[in-house]
């Protein structure tokens, strides 16, 4: 079951395809291709205690600098620079998703408005009286907040979900006490 879960993106700066691939254990690699048929492995990466389902995508930070995010199945990620030949992590491993209800997230590329949209699998929650035990998450928009090595990934439900709202409940600043 190793060596799977390819994620392929286009890198316009070098006019080549880039593939993030899970190898085994906590090991991944990056490959490139100009024709999407013949691939060359050019970098190995690891995310400690993370396996499967890599993702690799660009986002701009608060300073406007293009950064690349390397993401593993458990929502652990690295932010760094990528020149088409080398991914250079500029942060330690960061955590964006915790718990069993977010796994194997993937982004959608080339959205018409340039947003980075992500969905993940939800598996592990108990849903009383439901005829299923897994589902997809709602789509979220990803952005980077901060710059340099002080940057984090932020997820927010996509704006299209606002059209589904039917009513709003507002709660005042009441204190919540145990047993109330």
Where are the language model's segments positioned?
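Hydrophobic core segments of beta-strands in well-ordered, beta-rich domains
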Residues: 1-31, 41-46, 53-57, 64-74, ...
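Blade-edge beta-strand/turn elements of extracellular beta-propeller
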Residues: 1, 29-48, 79-98, 150-156
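A structural signal for short hydrophobic beta-strand segments in well-ordered beta-sheet cores
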Residues: 8, 56, 80, 107, ...
